[in-house]
Amino acid sequence: MNKKNREVTSSWFTNLRDLVCAEFEKIEEEYAKAKGLKPGKFVRSSWERDGGGGGVMSVMKGEVFEKVGVNISTVFGEFSKAFRAEIPGAELDGKFFATGISLVAHLKSPLIPAMHFNTRYIETSKNWFGGGGDLTPFYPEEDETAKFHAAFKEACDKYDSGYYPKFKKQCDEYFYLKHRKEPRGVGGIFYDYLNSGNFEQDFSFTQDVGKALLSVYPEIVRNKLFLPWTDEQKEYQLIRRGRYVEFNLLYDRGTKFGLMTDGNVEAILMSLPPEVKWA
């Protein structure tokens, strides 16, 4: 395992966390000031993992963001024997190191899309990056979807013209509810097991994926910040959120990885919306 690689990746995820939290709090302040309300603020709580490592969970419940969670973690140790076969390079001794950031935003307004994003770096006897971002609007708009995809395409095209079509396809396939036979949202990009043989390039790409998210999602939120919405639209949002819950509990790799490595349960389930309905 490479100590320097572990340190620089972990440091970046912490830095990205700070940038995201600052920008989301700024949006809260803009809205609250205009409406004469008290803006939400992130509340942080640290946790430690018995087997090694830990993380920091940042959660904000505000006037714009009904619930947004940003979790960073750096954990290490040994996979259980039952889980080793599922992780590349873990078959022999099961040792691993994993660091990353995960964030999910659920907005009060049903007109503003929910968003999920994560990037991570993992070492076993092998090493790789993974992650991506995806958008879940309740009332999709073509221009908004195109803008979201364009930000990630620009990040991808800097490195390989084949990245975006490949990672978009992987996102569409991954965020699909098989039991419902429907996609979770309008996609984005999703990549895993990325190791081109050039650590610096793969790390730079992963950083640019984070910067792409910061460049586009706050703009999407601000564009609809003051649009009025109805009780019927809110009800529809709550029902559609049920799909989000179903995916995260049935299919999400991050949820499974966290639970199988004795991660913090509250941090792992941080992505679940604060209120949801099933019809």
UniProtKB/Swiss-Prot annotation:
Could you tell me one molecular function GO term of this UniProt entry?
A: protein homodimerization activity
Its pathway, per UniProt, is: Porphyrin-containing compound metabolism; protoporphyrin-IX biosynthesis; protoporphyrinogen-IX from coproporphyrinogen-III (O2 route): step 1/1
Q: What is its main location?
A: cytoplasm
Q: Which UniProt keywords apply?
A: Cytoplasm, Heme biosynthesis, Metal-binding, Oxidoreductase, Porphyrin biosynthesis
Report the superkingdom from the record: Bacteria
Question: Could you confirm whether the keyword ATP-binding appears in this record?
Answer: no
Catalytic activities: coproporphyrinogen III + O2 + 2 H(+) = protoporphyrinogen IX + 2 CO2 + 2 H2O
- Compartment list: Cytoplasm
Important for dimerization: annotated segments? 244-279
**A GO CC annotation given for this chain:** cytoplasm
Location of the active site: H116
* Cofactor(s) this protein requires: a divalent metal cation
User: Record-annotated residues binding substrate?
Assistant: S102, N118, T119, R120
Q: Spell out the protein name for this chain.
A: Oxygen-dependent coproporphyrinogen-III oxidase
Q: Which organism is it from?
A: Rickettsia bellii (strain OSU 85-389)
Which gene is transcribed and translated to give this protein? hemF
